């Protein structure tokens, strides 16, 4: 169902000659912002860093004491080859690991299953047994490195294998640190890699909440993901709204299963996309943090301040990378990573510039990691907390994103929550994706090297 013009969440198609400027969420950008664009009660809306409503960040000092975790997503072919890449990243300064699995593993299939022909090791590492997990983490001390696993339907099985490898290393389960994505709802909405119907799959998700509370208390039990919605074509407002709506669904399901909110909510984490519009992205992260704090405190009655904090990982936008003039992607990734840092991310993956063409080479992976290090040590973005706070433009954007996202969440609530609203969210994202393509097609939106500054005889990288 399309939204009305008054409550638009995607940009209109107006043509390249229209003087108006819009974000992808349909927010019209004024030529100039001033103090009368600031929201009322701004000091209360902002709060202090590390304090409710966490608009300015979940920690008081943010990056002054410690930079975000530089967690590069990697995994391909065999466990041995993935292990080599993990060692390479750690040796070059990565401070955490992020494990990519192939599609058969994501669907709970063994590599020798006939249905897996042509897919084994293609999009990530194939893990068929504990032997593969042992090889993948050979020589990597699991008490020193935190690992994020991008796995959903069979998340509990892969976490158990990881736990057992840790046990073999002499690392007690209570000392393991990391995250399982474990977000099955976004699979129905955006990716399609699910095994069971939604209701049963959500139960498995919340079962892992209970298991980790008892066995692996430092583990983040879920990474509630908006990243994939944005990759599928949603706007920034839709990314915030549908991610938090799914978060609401998981919290409610866990409570309905008998869990106490303050016993599982502090280990919930989120996963967002870092897109091209720096100012909108900074505003998006700030709005999401403020909204989640209120949802947890007011809607669910959480008392523990840790339950109010939206902690999130960011990956730069894969969908923004171009096969044409791929070196341009280095600049795109740097801007997206900069926005994520200025927006207060807890960890970050920066994409390789060649990922529109193939799995990243070692050179591309190193440049991506160096990009984070330059942001952290040279740009000044880490020197002060929430550097865009008080900006007329960013504060106005933060407020507008929050207002529009709240309206979308209300619509999901009216439909009975995320499980019942799967088709609604899919349709909204598809309409937004169509708008993206139309705006590019008519040159309303510009992609350098694709529909402007095109080279007739492009150089193909090695």
Model-flagged regions — what are they?
Residues 10-40, 48-54, 103, 362, ...:
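Flexible, glycine-rich loop/tail regions that form catalytic "lids" or insertion modules at the edges
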Residues 128, 146, 151-154, 166-168, ...:
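Phosphate/diphosphate-binding loops
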Residues 2-275, 299, 306-313, 341, ...:
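Catalytic alpha/beta active-site cores
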